[in-house]
């Protein structure tokens, strides 16, 4: 029963299991959207470029992300502040162009593509928050900032992308890939200018075993 724009009363047919306690979050799964975000120009945003968070399919294709202040793309999720929608289960980010994102460090500015669910106790997680994220055939024209940051993500692929570095802004001097409690990561067939090859030394790993990251140049 809807009592107001911010309050619902839910009547259950059976008692809740003992594991459900006060403070747990509930979502209406009937209203999860799928998303196709295609052929748009996202330019000069003061925060992140675009934020996507839904368990349904997400396709981000053929867009220009130009000089966003923070991350160009943010996959979020939490039940403690913003109450962004639940975990992403299938995300494809392909054939986009990213130009000099992360020109400031205001908020959620860990990388050009930032997968940032807000999880208080990662070590106590029984499963990963996000999963099945494919980043392919994109062009990054960027100064020296991290390309990809992820927390609690399983099956993450960064493949067949082109990265062209410039000196338009002062570099951060950080590793291009940063993973915090992630698994099944593939970094493959990416082209970098000026030429370089990536190794596990280009990854900052927290609570992520090195054998969960496969790099093929």
Name what the model sees in each region.
Residues 1-217:
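Extracellular parallel beta-helix/beta-solenoid repeat domains
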